């Protein structure tokens, strides 16, 4: 895919780490990296408008192939003019392959060489998602960046199982490349798997790099392993990927994990975390994790995060946010979701500046101490 519509441009490498500052050029515009991508599962980032996403600095969003295939259907979206037009988003979109949802949501799934048969979680009907079908759906959606179909083995599965799994994922990747109908306006990424086994990650990366994808995703992390185990896998995996292609760590959104991924050379991240925890009133702030629903904030008339200049923090108090959430008002979820997304996008902006200034390790130390990780024992 040497004439790929997705191009990575390296701007600067950080002197003391593997971090890199760059930009990714797509058919729907260019965005800076490292970048966090908000997740729009059902062709919407929950409770946020496209205008709000642009306002907070989101250069690209992610949407889910599995969910859009089942409802409203990829062919309907194609008739609407593609996903960009359907959801009124004129900037880059990345779609996943649907594989992770099949493994995590669907019932009675069965993995064969052909693909994965499963029960539709909406109506119980039996369906098959194959490498070719995953590509066909994404071709209909018209995303800028597509994912090849993979199996995501659990981190602690036995070596022999993971070995068979990555070999099948490589065969599926090759089939997906052959099925790709729109290589000139949609980039396709391969997904490196291998659980925690260095030799299997190496084999997976070698297979996929030889196929010359537009970029490479690192899958099978943030699925229950420790933070240290994830960092150890990233330490060797990013080294196996080409310098002239984007690197994407899937499903990671905790602030310290984002910084640690960047330190190891990752360019792109996505996660439902900021919006999911916002719906329960959990907010990421410059002083750490804050559950604004808690009784201690009932008469707290200060901003959610005094150091944040997002719409929520500029206009509303902790007491008001608590009231909205306790009263089950959607506006409360909109405001906490906006803040959490803004917080992570702004964190990545600070990370990009730290790479420019060659002080990313100092920034990490300052951020982690201030966020209070060691006090709470939690990573968000």
Swiss-Prot record:
GO cellular component, one term: cytosol
Active-site residues, record numbering mapped to chain: 96 (proton acceptor), 270 (nucleophile)
Domain of life: Bacteria
UniProt cofactor note: Binds 1 zinc ion per subunit.
Keywords: Glycosyltransferase, Metal-binding, Queuosine biosynthesis, Transferase, tRNA processing, Zinc
Positions with a binding annotation for substrate: 96-100, 150, 193, 220
Stretches the record annotates as RNA binding: 251-257, 275-279
Pathway: tRNA modification; tRNA-queuosine biosynthesis
EC number: 2.4.2.29
Cofactor(s) demanded: Zn(2+)
Catalytic activity: 7-aminomethyl-7-carbaguanine + guanosine(34) in tRNA = 7-aminomethyl-7-carbaguanosine(34) in tRNA + guanine
GO MF annotations in UniProt: metal ion binding; tRNA-guanosine(34) queuine transglycosylase activity
Family matches, as InterPro entries: ArchSynthase1/Queuine_TRR, TGT, TGT-like_sf, tRNA_ribo_trans-like
Pfam families given in the database record: TGT (PF01702)
Binding site for Zn(2+): 308, 310, 313, 339
GO biological process: queuosine biosynthetic process; tRNA wobble guanine modification; tRNA-guanine transglycosylation
Record note on quaternary structure: Homodimer. Within each dimer, one monomer is responsible for RNA recognition and catalysis, while the other monomer binds to the replacement base PreQ1.
Similarity comment text for this entry: Belongs to the queuine tRNA-ribosyltransferase family.
Stated role: Catalyzes the base-exchange of a guanine (G) residue with the queuine precursor 7-aminomethyl-7-deazaguanine (PreQ1) at position 34 (anticodon wobble position) in tRNAs with GU(N) anticodons (tRNA-Asp, -Asn, -His and -Tyr). Catalysis occurs through a double-displacement mechanism. The nucleophile active site attacks the C1' of nucleotide 34 to detach the guanine base from the RNA, forming a covalent enzyme-RNA intermediate. The proton acceptor active site deprotonates the incoming PreQ1, allowing a nucleophilic attack on the C1' of the ribose to form the product.
NCBIfam families with a match to the protein in the record: Q_tRNA_tgt (TIGR00430), tgt_general (TIGR00449)
PANTHER family: QUEUINE TRNA-RIBOSYLTRANSFERASE (PTHR46499:SF1)
HAMAP family: Q_tRNA_Tgt
Name of the protein in question: Queuine tRNA-ribosyltransferase
Species this protein is from: Streptococcus pneumoniae (strain P1031)
The encoding gene: tgt
């Amino acid at each position: 895919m040497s004439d790929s519509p997705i191009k990575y441009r390296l701007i600067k490498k950080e002197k003391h780490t593997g971090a890199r500052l760059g930009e990714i050029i797509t058919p729907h515009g260019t965005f800076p990296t490292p970048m966090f991508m908000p997740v729009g599962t059902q062709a919407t980032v929950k409770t946020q408008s496209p205008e709000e996403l642009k306002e907070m600095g989101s250069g690209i969003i992610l949407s889910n192939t599995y969910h859009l295939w089942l409802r409203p259907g990829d062919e309907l979206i194609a008739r609407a003019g593609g996903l960009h037009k359907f959801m009124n988003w004129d900037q880059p979109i990345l779609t996943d392959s649907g594989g992770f949802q099949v493994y995590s949501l669907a019932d009675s799934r069965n993995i064969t060489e052909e693909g994965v048969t499963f029960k539709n979680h909406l109506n119980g009907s039996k369906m098959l998602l194959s490498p070719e079908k995953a590509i066909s759906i994404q071709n209909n959606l018209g995303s800028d960046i597509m994912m090849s179909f993979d199996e995501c083995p659990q981190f602690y599965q036995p070596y022999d199982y993971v070995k068979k799994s990555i070999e099948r994922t490589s065969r599926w990747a090759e089939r997906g490349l052959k099925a790709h109908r729109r290589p000139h306006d949609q980039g396709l990424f391969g997904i490196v798997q291998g659980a925690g086994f260095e030799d299997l990650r190496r084999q997976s990366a070698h297979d996929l790099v030889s196929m010359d994808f537009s970029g490479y995703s690192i899958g099978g992390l943030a699925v229950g392993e420790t933070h240290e185990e994830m960092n150890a896998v990233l330490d060797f995996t990013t080294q196996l990927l080409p310098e002239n292609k984007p690197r994407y760590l899937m499903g990671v959104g905790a602030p310290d994990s984002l910084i640690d991924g960047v330190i190891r050379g990752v360019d792109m991240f996505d996660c439902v975390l900021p919006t999911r925890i916002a719906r329960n009133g959990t907010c990421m702030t410059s002083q750490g994790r804050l559950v604004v629903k808690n009784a201690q904030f009932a008469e707290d008339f200060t901003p959610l995060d005094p150091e944040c200049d997002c719409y929520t923090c500029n206009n509303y108090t902790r007491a008001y946010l608590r009231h909205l959430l306790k009263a089950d008002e959607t506006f409360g979820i909109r405001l906490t979701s906006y803040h959490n997304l803004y917080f992570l996008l702004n964190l990545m902006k600070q990370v990009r500046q730290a790479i420019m200034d060659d002080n990313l390790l100092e920034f990490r130390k300052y951020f982690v101490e201030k966020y209070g990780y060691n006090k709470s024992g939690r990573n968000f």
